[in-house]
From Swiss-Prot:
A motif (Di-leucine internalization motif) lies at residues 862-863. It comes from Human immunodeficiency virus type 1 group O (isolate ANT70) (HIV-1). Keywords: AIDS, Apoptosis, Clathrin-mediated endocytosis of virus by host, Cleavage on pair of basic residues, Coiled coil, Disulfide bond, Fusion of virus membrane with host endosomal membrane, Fusion of virus membrane with host membrane, Glycoprotein, Host cell membrane, Host endosome, Host membrane, Host-virus interaction, Lipoprotein, Membrane, Palmitate, Signal, Transmembrane, Transmembrane helix, Viral attachment to host cell, Viral envelope protein, Viral immunoevasion, Viral penetration into host cytoplasm, Virion, Virus endocytosis by host, Virus entry into host cell. Inhibitors targeting HIV-1 viral envelope proteins are used as antiretroviral drugs. Attachment of virions to the cell surface via non-specific interactions and CD4 binding can be blocked by inhibitors that include cyanovirin-N, cyclotriazadisulfonamide analogs, PRO 2000, TNX 355 and PRO 542. In addition, BMS 806 can block CD4-induced conformational changes. Env interactions with the coreceptor molecules can be targeted by CCR5 antagonists including SCH-D, maraviroc (UK 427857) and aplaviroc (GW 873140), and the CXCR4 antagonist AMD 070. HIV-1 lineages are divided in three main groups, M (for Major), O (for Outlier), and N (for New, or Non-M, Non-O). The vast majority of strains found worldwide belong to the group M. Group O seems to be endemic to and largely confined to Cameroon and neighboring countries in West Central Africa, where these viruses represent a small minority of HIV-1 strains. The group N is represented by a limited number of isolates from Cameroonian persons. The group M is further subdivided in 9 clades or subtypes (A to D, F to H, J and K). The keyword Signal applies. Residues 292-326 are annotated as: V3. Residues 514-534 are annotated as: Fusion peptide. This is Envelope glycoprotein gp160. Residues 458-469, 460-469 are annotated as: V5. Glycans are attached at residues 59, 88, 149, 174, 180, 193, 225, 230, 237, 258, 285, 289, 320, 330, 350, 356, 360, 390, 396, 404, 410, 439, 445, 458, 463, 613, 619, 637. Residues 1-32 form the signal peptide. Residues 131-145 are annotated as: V1. Residues 362-372 are annotated as: CD4-binding loop.
Amino acid sequence: MIVTMKAMEKRNKKLWTLYLAMALITPCLSLRQLYATVYAGVPVWEDATPVLFCASDANLTSTEKHNIWASQACVPTDPTPYEYPLHNVTDDFNIWKNYMVEQMQEDIISLWDQSLKPCVQMTFLCVQMECTNIAGTTNENLMKKCEFNVTTVIKDKKEKKQALFYVSDLMELNETSSTNKTNSKMYTLTNCNSTTITQACPKVSFEPIPIHYCAPAGYAIFKCNSTEFNGTGTCRNITVVTCTHGIRPTVSTQLILNGTLSKGKIRMMAKDILEGGKNIIVTLNSTLNMTCERPQIDIQEMRIGPMAWYSMGIGGTAGNSSRAAYCKYNATDWGKILKQTAERYLELVNNTGSINMTFNHSSGGDLEVTHLHFNCHGEFFYCNTAKMFNYTFSCNGTTCSVSNVSQGNNGTLPCKLRQVVRSWIRGQSGLYAPPIKGNLTCMSNITGMILQMDNTWNSSNNNVTFRPIGGDMKDIWRTELFNYKVVRVKPFSVAPTRIARPVISTRTHREKRAVGLGMLFLGVLSAAGSTMGAAATTLAVQTHTLLKGIVQQQDNLLRAIQAQQQLLRLSXWGIRQLRARLLALETLLQNQQLLSLWGCKGKLVCYTSVKWNRTWIGNESIWDTLTWQEWDRQISNISSTIYEEIQKAQVQQEQNEKKLLELDEWASIWNWLDITKWLWYIKIAIIIVGALVGVRVIMIVLNIVKNIRQGYQPLSLQIPNHHQEEAGTPGRTGGGGGEEGRPRWIPSPQGFLPLLYTDLRTIILWTYHLLSNLASGIQKVISYLRLGLWILGQKIINVCRICAAVTQYWLQELQNSATSLLDTLAVAVANWTDGIIAGIQRIGTGIRNIPRRIRQGLERSLL
């Protein structure tokens, strides 16, 4: 057996060498060349800051300022908005660096500038006014009756006027009164020395309507739908939308009115929620109704020269104490809201100890910051919120209870009214808001608040105080835009495939498809979470579906721009819409130009002849493991190099096509008869004749060499020719020997055509013999190869048989050894088992005989 194994080992050494060589060669054979392929409309994006445009359902017949502004500045909303979920996609959001907030701030400033459009310069009121108190007015809205002189149409003539002013709108002068009236002092309007005061007109209803912000073509808006998302960080539940939800541009301080509620728990947003002195934006998960009223008043129109000025009527105001404005709310529900806010904050900071959470009034500042400031139908309210923020909660962990309850179910906020207001837009005074006739009522929903902590959070501190704050309107817009971000959809990407573009192509069969690559952004992104291979199969269908929606969007933009041009009101929003449209067109043209330079115009998948460099990352495994977004991040540093190589290859392709088109001139037979071509034809003929002569010489040399190697001497080129003897010549015998009529070989000249025929015939025969020999040689090689493969197969079969025999032999040996071991073990066990059994039997017999032995002993003793 040992001899057999050694023989087998010796025989298989060569086979092991062959197997090792095949194992090394096989991976090399499997590495196929990859080529760069351009894919259009892939789900790849990057953060961007384009110009957004707005959409709204404005009522064209309404005179309300928001409607007028929206009808002129915004396009109609989409009746069937698209929202595509992005599965398996995560992205980072940061509301504190979101440019959408900045743009909305600019837009709302534009809205207010138009809604409170100044039309009358009020510089004539910046004069000394003699004012007296009015009995019956409340402390919150103290009023004075003032007399002042104004210039009439005739400049050198003065006229005395009377008007009512709120004390908060007046500034006392040190001048003494020229009259002897009691309680009379000299006043002027506030801030007359710092700015020009203008009157807002006309004063009508001021009810904000929802405005949707939309991304232009080629861009998309990501929306985070996670209920626990607070505006900063990574979101894992993302959808793609064309426009945001409807946002009501309600301007207020301290409280957020008519906003969007939090879907889950109360949301608290801040740059650092632990730091004191920083704004904390609170979004509630339930609303609290607040109703604000201003009683009936009369107004009077005063003609000052060619201008009209409106003020409160003097006749119906004196003695009327019901002029106080106020806001009502449910104090019990408000206390619950503050309690939930405190508990939510403690939950976010992971509080575990006991602490007192206090809500206190504003610490001071401008009237717009220390009071709840908002606009109600054109009147500017300044409401004292000290009662709303007068709560203390005793908390243990994240559970709080009310320590002081000083209010009933109904809460009332006293409010001031001002005619000369400080504009929140640019932080200056100078807007005179004329009083509105009649009774004013505004019903709002409290959906949030803006707070500040007195001190930085410290778990060892037992007291935390929150105060309301306001003034930065961007915080209000952040509550609406915290879960949005704008991205630019990259029109194309590049990836390696095994398919290469033909090196030369006349492009006669290129498909003419007008694909707007710069406009593919919604449905394409819906496949963002899929792998590259899965996403590439659905691009064509989504592209066709989405292109129609983008075309409609562009048409709506164009209609809005045309309407503004007809109304001669191409304002900043009209310019913004025009920029959005031009941006889309410029993006489209730029993308189409790049695709044209690469030879990919009109193609969704464009194969190129650029070989994928092994130094570039990526192989065929990326199609099943990576998404397009992940792949784009990996090649971001080398994509420009790849595109340059594609452009160079396309330039070479164009040059090759030019040469190919030049050869296409052979298709016209008339070009053959051109006199300028004749010299070229003669040149070709000379080349052909020279080639034939050269081949003839080579054949002669080869034949001579062959004959010399076979032992023959070279003969002159002769042809047989039968020579007829002249008549009358007697025949002779014997002298020359042989037959007299035998033909003789003598040289004979030939013509050009017979010689050409002979040469061609000889060349063809020689080529035929050469190819025949080559075919026979190939046949022999194939037969040898087949024989070798057959022998190799036989050897492999023999090796398998030997392996099977060896395996069978060893199995049999193992079986025999196991059987022998079991037999030996059985014999050994049997030997010592028999002794044990015999011993046990003896012991048992002895025990069994004990009674008998006892009986026998007793019998003997009795005998």
